[in-house]
Regions:
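A short coil-to-beta-strand element that immediately follows conserved catalytic motifs
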Residues: 65-75
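Conserved N-terminal beta-strand and adjoining loop/helix that marks the start
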Residues: 1-22, 92
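Short, solvent-exposed loop/turn segments that connect beta-strands within catalytic domains
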Residues: 14-21, 32-33, 82-84, 99
């Protein structure tokens, strides 16, 4: 099966109320995730490494330049599709002041995690959001 690398950016903020907020935007292309709320990102081109791709994609999709030095790679999440395996390279970025008008913040609580957004976000993003919440929550309680 063909491997298709994709780099995504998660802008997040951890609130004093022990809640996580992640920034998403509505997908407008005609692909399988049309109309869903998704993280900025896209395919890694042949001449790029995933970090370069995520910086380029954020610029293309959101119109802001992010400092690659602020990125933290969270992990790689495989997603099986009918004709390929998508490898999601997930990069975390701190909140950026220019995001507020170009998308929306989703609030994630410990009791439900990403479950309230079922049908509103792509399936693979549930695992990513839930893992991110657990990681940040555990770091706050060490």
């Amino acid at each position: 099966m063909k491997l298709f690398p994709v780099a995504i950016a998660i802008f997040y903020r951890w609130l004093p109320t022990q809640k996580l907020e992640v920034w998403v935007q509505k997908r407008v292309d005609d692909g399988p995730f049309h109309g869903l709320l998704e993280f900025p990102g896209g395919g890694v081109e042949a001449h790029e490494v995933p970090l370069q791709a995520v910086v380029r994609e954020v610029d293309e999709e959101v119109g802001i330049l992010v400092d690659p030095g602020l990125a933290t790679q969270m992990g790689i999440y495989p997603n099986e599709m009918p004709n390929r395996t998508v490898l999601l390279y997930v990069f975390l970025f701190p909140e950026h002041s220019e995001l507020n008008t170009k998308g929306q913040w989703l609030e994630i609580e410990q009791t439900q995690l990403s479950a309230p957004y079922k049908g509103q976000i792509p399936g693979p993003n549930h695992l990513i959001i839930d893992d991110l919440f657990r990681h940040l929550y555990d770091n706050q309680h060490e």
